[in-house]
Amino acid sequence: MQENREGRMETIIYDTGIIGKLKIKGNQKEIREIAFLRDPFPSVFFEGSVLPAVEEPAYTRNNLNCAEVAPVLKKACRQIQEYLEEEREEFTFPIRMEGTRFQEEVWCAMLDIPYGETRTYREIAEAAGSPKAWRAVGIAANHNRLPLVIPCHRVIGSRGRLTGYNGGLDIKEKLLTIESHRTMQKQLEE
């Protein structure tokens, strides 16, 4: 287990029941990484090594409170579950982005995409100050270690097509559907 000045790094597997299992890594202060564990694939590349997706027991909403894990990990799991159940639009748990300057500019531009809306790769490139680097935006999105929180699922192709997503296009479509459904519900209530 890694140790640094912020404390021991912990990794848990959380089963959302909606988009499958997530591997969430953090310490006492912040979340550093969220990764999708996809079935039927038996493993996922995570932190430089291949880890089995089914070896560790997964926490769920029902047993998370009993878990002896960092409070920030519990908070992240709760907020992710609320988001997936259309009860939350933004995350408030602390995160740490780690990437190149360009990647971090792209991720910050993605953080500015409102819930329920999408932007094209070209629009994100412009927002990040590099209007011709729209292909590089796709590469930066692929290196996003905090999917869901940094909403790269809200970035689409120039013709409105769904393109690449670490969790798979089916998950990207599901996340966009969740957001559009909640947005429509809110509009109907107004």
Regions found by a protein language model. Name each.
Residues 7-18, 82, 87-190:
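Nucleic acid-binding interface residues in structured DNA/RNA-binding domains
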Residues 1-88, 158-190:
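Low-complexity, small/basic-enriched stretches
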